[in-house]
Amino acid sequence: MLSKYLDRIDFSSYEDFKKNYKVKTPGDFNFGFDIVDGWAEEKGDNRALLWCDDDGNEKCFTFADMKRLSAKAANFFSEKGLKKGDVAMLILRRRWEYWVAAVGLMKLGVTFIPGTLQLTKKDITYRANAAGVSAIVCVDDEYVISQVEESKPDMPGV
């Protein structure tokens, strides 16, 4: 996989790395398909993501899991009307779903903006209008939902 995108992966020094490190990406490069799904094809059972929270909960995802879940997310977002060139805002806390949504959006060619839970109505409205956001994906949190709902009348593109 690495040799597909890198001429070299071993370097003798930092100076050698700075001088010779080059990433090759084709014009139609898509991180979701080319990297995540590529690793799933080569090493599907390898760990791609280990998520944990402050309460000690853990969830492990393989590359095969990420391929499958991100494809489902991409299909869901596509059914909701998102398409290449659109912009979405993700307000998902530090949840594992963030990574599935992010890769799913990448597969569609949708640019995404991560947002903190501390965003207010004013912050959400400004970011959505400035970036041309057409969708907001947010966590099931009373405060976040209230701020997004209150922002909706001032975000005609969402």
List each language-model region with its residue ranges:
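A short N-terminal helical cap/helix-turn-helix that marks the beginning
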Residues: M1-R8, G27-L49, R68
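A generic structural signal for short, solvent-exposed coil/turn residues
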Residues: S3, E15, E41-K43, D55, ...
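Short, contiguous pre-domain boundary segments
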Residues: S12-K22
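Active-site diphosphate/adenylate-binding microenvironment
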Residues: K22-G27, R94
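Short, solvent-exposed loop/helix junctions and linker helices
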Residues: P26-N30, C60, Q118
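Conserved AMP-binding/adenylate-forming core of the ANL superfamily
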Residues: D45, L49-V103, T120-T125
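Structural core segment of the AMP-binding/adenylate-forming
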Residues: E79, V103, K107-V158
